[in-house]
Amino acid sequence: MNKGLLTLLLLFTCFAHAQVVDTWQFANPQQQQQALNIASQLRCPQCQNQNLLESNAPVAVSMRHQVYSMVAEGKNEVEIIGWMTERYGDFVRYNPPLTGQTLVLWALPVVLLLLMALILWRVRAKR
């Protein structure tokens, strides 16, 4: 009985790391590389901090297949990322554009660093 249980446990362990594999057929290796590059730049809207290649959420699979089909249609990276941004918002981009809304996010670290340097300089000047 213990031998059978151990065999069953080992069998399940082999399949514990199984993942979903995309079987999308590309016309050439360049298209495949382009599609994978674009999908790695886009964030899954459902899973925090995972790109479309890493996530197996249904929305990520759908978005990944959309990227693949758009690459197969001959669309370039700018068109595909633009379409995804239009549909899902700037959140899907790992590098959001510099706009009025994101300016605070880009400028805040620099402002805080300068503020800390000023405070440190004043404290040292008093001594």
Curated annotation (Swiss-Prot):
Localization terms from the record: Periplasm
**Could you name the domain of life of the organism this protein comes from?**
Bacteria
Q: Read off the InterPro entries from this record.
A: C-type_cytochrome_biogenesis, CcmH/CycL/Ccl2/NrfF_N, CcmH/CycL/NrfF/Ccl2_sf, For-dep_Cytc_NO2Rdtase_NrfF
Q: Which GO terms describe its molecular function?
A: metal ion binding
**Residue sites binding heme per the record:** 44, 47
Asked if Heme is a keyword of the record, the answer is yes
Identify the keywords attached in UniProt to this record, alphabetized: Heme, Iron, Metal-binding, Periplasm, Signal
Q: Which gene encodes it?
A: nrfF
Function per UniProt? Not required for the biosynthesis of any of the c-type cytochromes. Possible subunit of a heme lyase.
Instruction: Give a GO cellular-component term.
Output: plasma membrane
Q: Where is the signal peptide?
A: 1-27
Protein name, as recorded: Formate-dependent nitrite reductase complex subunit NrfF
Species whose genome carries this gene? Escherichia coli (strain K12)
State the phenotype upon gene disruption.
Answer: Triple nrfE-nrfF-nrfG deletion mutants no longer attach heme 1 (covalently attached to 'Cys-122', the CWSCK motif) of cytochrome c552 (AC P0ABK9).
Q: What protein family is recorded?
A: Belongs to the CcmH/CycL/Ccl2/NrfF family.
